[in-house]
């Protein structure tokens, strides 16, 4: 028997079936580096319209985690898709390099700055440590396939950036937004530092819950305000608090001016509390018998004096709208140095703002003899005992509530009043302008707008000063008596900035003030506070972007970070930019969720559910991680697990196998020489190109709306349904069996060529390594990289007016699906092996029958059967299957008649008619020895 294998056009390609990504990707990265791929991209896109995504700098400490990977991959997908859309879209990666975590790491390595380690040595060690961390993180980001200007990254510790941060502060000072105040701020005892709002996390915490008596200094005055005779032995306010340790700093009692307050009589004692809470509070305290004496509005009691429970002074009653009746007694113990609301009341009433707590969280000497030098948290019980001994404690218990904690140490915070520098949110209407700017921005997801609006509405003034070493110096001089800034502050800060450009922040510490101030030095003090690291990163729109030539005279289009950055980088950038130029620094803000495990829990070493991006990449390849990111709706928390990654692997295989089939069937195809014009192509091939055009339009729309999971879904639909389950199955016979150079085969190859040209671009932003690999196997002359291409422009739509339009082929898809069902049932029953062992009868209503007959004897190629007959719908017997998709269609399936062709495997009646080729059908004989078969439709 003749071996007919050599007469077939079997698929052939060097493009491997298996990705072996963990091995191949590093090789590709090496080639990208040798190509200087990023510069090739910049050259190719020079002069085009611009799209700028500004990289929010990750902190230069520790290995990258899965959240970092999500962030960088999303940015890379956007930038690569924008280049496909014809944009010049440079990407400058950055790092946040100053701050306490690095200081603490360096302290562990060399000790604290002091006697053994000088400040300059410590700064050098911090800089070296941060540089080392950046190097490692950069390597990991590059491994993810992120294309950027890795040779020209920005770091907030770069000398020129440090200088520009000083200049940014100078502009904000010039615009009148900065002031110094002795104001309570979140303070971490372990950090020995003030914390920014973005560095505060909230956890459940158990605190003391106590009810304290503040007795009136003059019961006659209080009774008079209530309009009653002075018949009670005492009158006291009943105060509830969860921070007994702050009572030594109490300087007032706050009540709401418009709430009703009742004086109630218990035995011969009078207690004042909010009228709405009397019953619930007294019942809770175990007081069964009381009498309501009088009810009045809070404002009537303003400025009455009440004795501090154990200190030798009295305090006033003050009015405040922040007092509520949600919890407590409607009467608030007020310590202006230990709470933001208390501080504001203190300023309004000119109360003493006394700092009783040191940086270590211990009471300062002179606070109270029993408390001096003890930890505030350990002293809660001491204060409670003091209150009890003085008869000022009515009840003690505990309460579990949400409480601020340090994001680094996970330990509870205190509010502590220290001299700090602030950006005022209201002095120059910065809050009002920021809220206006928020409305102009595109927020993705849209509910982000409400989140940041609420945060801006409720945030306190921004404490921008820190009492540390490793950071950008504020570069200020303050008058010793007036405490005002030097009148030439702008000029001084510019001088310092120029010195910092040469020597870094060490220039400030080395600076001799006399060189700047001359004889005026006796009147001014050098401020050695450094800036909050959130000011560093939040001002990069000014300190970095304005200094980058790539971004010259262009606004930033997009910021993209995790959901926690609403109160972090998005917030600090918004405030600093609005303070400088009255407008937001970005046009669009995208927020992504956190990576969580299959149970919805955040990644945690203690839980043991951490998914390491390095391990995923080393095992599965970066493209699998990238595909997981793109496949997940990033606007919510993103679930990752071994099972989910397996699904990404399955998705990847489908895409890769589709690409491999296309490439393998382009064997021997040279586009310039063999391409068939669209009007001469077989109709099914025109339809395939039409489907690719429709898919591309939808994919581009999804990229434009940043819905990458929709991109993946549409690519999968195209590969699995339109191609894999229909077109690619059908064309195998024509591709393999028709003559090598026939129009029938070249038409098909032309379609496959156009499809792979389009498809490689669709996947390039997501599975970048695989797209790059495919690019090298597509026939024809081409540019050095898919990443300098734009969307493929040689697709086309079918003419909707022609009879074999989309609607026609959709009908055939439905018919084929029903036939496939019958074939699959026959396979399950083991009645057949291959679909080519069958012939099918389609009992059709007249209109459908007419449509089916349009394909003539090519219809059976669509159905993958050896034969097909079309009969009248009414002739169908009870054995025919009623189509579930088309009302006017019933189907029967039978064994094909004839013998099996050893070449095409169809069952035909004419096998053996040709004595030279007795094992094959007449169609195959024509394709081997004749002029070749003709195809019009399929």
Swiss-Prot record:
InterPro entries: aa-tRNA-synth_I_CS, aa-tRNA-synth_Ia, Anticodon_Ile_BEm, Ile-tRNA-ligase, Ile-tRNA-ligase_type1, Ile-tRNA_ligase, M/V/L/I-tRNA-synth_anticd-bd, Rossmann-like_a/b/a_fold. GO terms for biological process: isoleucyl-tRNA aminoacylation. Zn(2+) binds at residues 901, 904, 921, 924. The keyword RNA-binding does not apply. Binds 1 zinc ion per subunit. GO terms for molecular function: aminoacyl-tRNA deacylase activity; ATP binding; isoleucine-tRNA ligase activity; tRNA binding; zinc ion binding. Its main location: cytoplasm. A motif ('HIGH' region) lies at residues 58-68. Its cofactor is Zn(2+). It is found in: Cytoplasm. Its EC number is 6.1.1.5. Pfam families: Anticodon_1 (PF08264), tRNA-synt_1 (PF00133), zf-FPG_IleRS (PF06827). A motif ('KMSKS' region) lies at residues 602-606. PANTHER family: ISOLEUCINE--TRNA LIGASE, MITOCHONDRIAL, SOLEUCYL-TRNA SYNTHETASE. Belongs to the class-I aminoacyl-tRNA synthetase family. IleS type 1 subfamily. IleRS has two distinct active sites: one for aminoacylation and one for editing. The misactivated valine is translocated from the active site to the editing site, which sterically excludes the correctly activated isoleucine. The single editing site contains two valyl binding pockets, one specific for each substrate (Val-AMP or Val-tRNA(Ile)). NCBIfam families: ileS. Monomer. Catalyzes the attachment of isoleucine to tRNA(Ile). As IleRS can inadvertently accommodate and process structurally similar amino acids such as valine, to avoid such errors it has two additional distinct tRNA(Ile)-dependent editing activities. One activity is designated as 'pretransfer' editing and involves the hydrolysis of activated Val-AMP. The other activity is designated 'posttransfer' editing and involves deacylation of mischarged Val-tRNA(Ile). This is Isoleucine--tRNA ligase.
């Amino acid at each position: 028997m003749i071996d007919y294998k050599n007469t077939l056009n079997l698929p052939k390609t060097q493009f491997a079936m298996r990705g072996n990504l963990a091995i191949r990707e590093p090789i590709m990265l090496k080639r990208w580096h040798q190509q200087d791929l990023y510069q090739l991209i910049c050259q190719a896109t020079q002069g085009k319209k611009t799209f700028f995504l500004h990289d929010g700098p990750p902190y230069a400490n520790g290995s990258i985690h899965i959240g970092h990977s999500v962030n960088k991959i999303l940015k890379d997908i956007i930038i690569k898709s924008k280049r496909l859309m014809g944009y010049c879209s440079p990407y400058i990666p950055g790092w946040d390099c100053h701050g306490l975590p690095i200081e603490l790491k360096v302290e562990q390595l060399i000790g604290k700055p002091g006697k053994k380690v000088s400040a300059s040595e410590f700064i050098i060690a911090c800089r070296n440590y941060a540089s080392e961390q950046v190097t490692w993180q950069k390597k990991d980001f590059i491994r993810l396939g992120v294309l950027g200007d890795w040779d020209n990254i920005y770091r907030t510790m770069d000398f020129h950036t440090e200088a520009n941060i000083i200049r940014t502060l100078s502009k904000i000072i010039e615009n009148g937004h900065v002031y110094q105040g002795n104001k309570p701020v979140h303070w971490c005892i372990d950090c020995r530092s003030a914390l920014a709002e973005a560095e505060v996390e909230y956890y459940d915490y158990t605190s003391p819950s106590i009810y304290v008596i503040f007795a009136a200094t003059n019961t006659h005055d209080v009774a008079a305000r209530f309009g009653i005779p002075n018949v009670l032995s005492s009158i006291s306010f009943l105060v509830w608090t969860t921070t007994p340790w702050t009572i030594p700093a109490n300087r007032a009692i706050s009540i709401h001016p418009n709430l009703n307050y009742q004086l109630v009589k218990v035995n011969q004692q009078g207690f004042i509390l909010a009228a709405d809470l009397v019953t619930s509070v007294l019942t809770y305290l175990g007081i069964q018998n009381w009498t309501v004496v009088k009810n009045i509005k809070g404002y009537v009691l303003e400025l009455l004096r009440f004795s501090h429970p154990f200190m030798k002074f009295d305090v006033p009653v003050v009015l405040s709208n922040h007092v509520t009746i949600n919890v407590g007694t409607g009467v608030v113990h007020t310590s202006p140095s230990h709470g933001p609301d208390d501080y504001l009341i203190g300023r309004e009433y000119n109360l003493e703002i006394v700092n009783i707590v040191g940086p270590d969280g211990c009471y300062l000497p002179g606070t109270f003899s029993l408390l001096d030098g003890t930890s505030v948290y350990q002293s809660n019980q001491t204060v409670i005992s003091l209150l009890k001994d003085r008869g000022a404690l009515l009840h003690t218990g505990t309460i579990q509530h949400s409480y601020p904690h340090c994001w680094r140490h996970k330990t509870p915070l205190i509010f502590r009043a220290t001299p700090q520098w602030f950006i005022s949110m209201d002095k120059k209407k910065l809050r009002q302008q920021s809220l206006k700017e928020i409305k102009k921005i595109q927020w993705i997801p849209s509910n982000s707008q409400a989140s940041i609006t609420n945060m801006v509405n409720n945030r306190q003034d921004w404490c921008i000063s820190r009492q540390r070493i490793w950071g950008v110096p504020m570069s200020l001089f303050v008058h010793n008596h007036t405490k005002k800034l030097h009148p030439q502050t702008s000029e001084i800060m510019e001088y310092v900035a120029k010195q910092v450009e040469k020597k870094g922040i060490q220039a400030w510490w080395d600076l001799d003030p006399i060189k700047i101030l001359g004889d005026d030095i006796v009147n001014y003090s050098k401020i050695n506070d450094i800036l909050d690291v959130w000011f560093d990163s939040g001002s990069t729109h000014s300190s970095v972007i304005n200094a980058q030539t790539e971004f010259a005279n262009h606004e930033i289009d997009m910021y993209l970070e995790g959901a926690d950055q609403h109160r972090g980088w998005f917030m600090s950038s918004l405030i600093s930019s609005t303070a400088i130029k009255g407008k937001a620094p970005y046009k669009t803000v995208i927020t992504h969720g956190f990576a969580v495990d299959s149970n919805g829990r955040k990644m945690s070493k203690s839980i043991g559910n951490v998914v390491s991006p390095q391990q995923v990449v080393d095992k599965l390849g970066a493209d699998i991680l990238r595909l997981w990111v793109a496949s997940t709706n990033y606007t919510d928390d993103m679930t990752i697990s071994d099972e989910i990654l397996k699904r990404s692997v399955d998705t990847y295989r489908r895409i890769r196998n589709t690409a491999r089939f296309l490439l393998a069937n382009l064997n021997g195809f040279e586009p310039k020489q063999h391409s068939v014009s669209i009007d001469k192509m077989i109709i099914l091939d025109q339809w395939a190109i039409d489907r690719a055009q429709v898919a591309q339009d939808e994919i581009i729309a999804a990229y434009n709306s940043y819905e990458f999971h929709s991109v993946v879904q549409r690519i999968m639909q195209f590969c699995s349904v339109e191609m894999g389950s229909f077109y690619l199955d059908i064309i195998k016979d024509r591709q393999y069996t028709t003559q090598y150079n026939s129009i029938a085969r070249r038409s098909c190859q032309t379609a496959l060529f156009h499809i792979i040209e389009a498809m490689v671009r669709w996947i390039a932003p997501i599975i970048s390594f695989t797209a790059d690999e495919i690019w090298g196997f597509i026939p024809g002359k081409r540019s050095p990289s898919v990443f300098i291409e734009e969307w493929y422009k040689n697709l086309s739509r079918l003419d909707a007016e022609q009879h074999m339009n989309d609607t026609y082929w959709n009908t055939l898809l439905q018919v084929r699906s029903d036939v496939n069902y019958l074939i699959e049932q026959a396979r399950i029953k083991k009645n057949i092996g291959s679909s080519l062992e069958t012939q099918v009868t389609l009992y059709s209503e007249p209109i459908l029958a007419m449509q089916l007959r349009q394909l003539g004897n090519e219809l059976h190629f669509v159905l993958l059967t050896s034969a097909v007959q079309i009969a009248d719908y009414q002739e169908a017997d009870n054995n025919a299957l009623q189509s579930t998709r088309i009302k006017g269609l019933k189907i029967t399936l039978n064994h094909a008649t004839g013998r099996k062709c050893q070449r095409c495997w169809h069952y035909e009646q004419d096998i053996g008619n040709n004595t030279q080729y007795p094992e094959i059908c007449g169609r195959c004989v024509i394709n081997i020895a004749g002029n070749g078969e003709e195809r019009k439709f399929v």
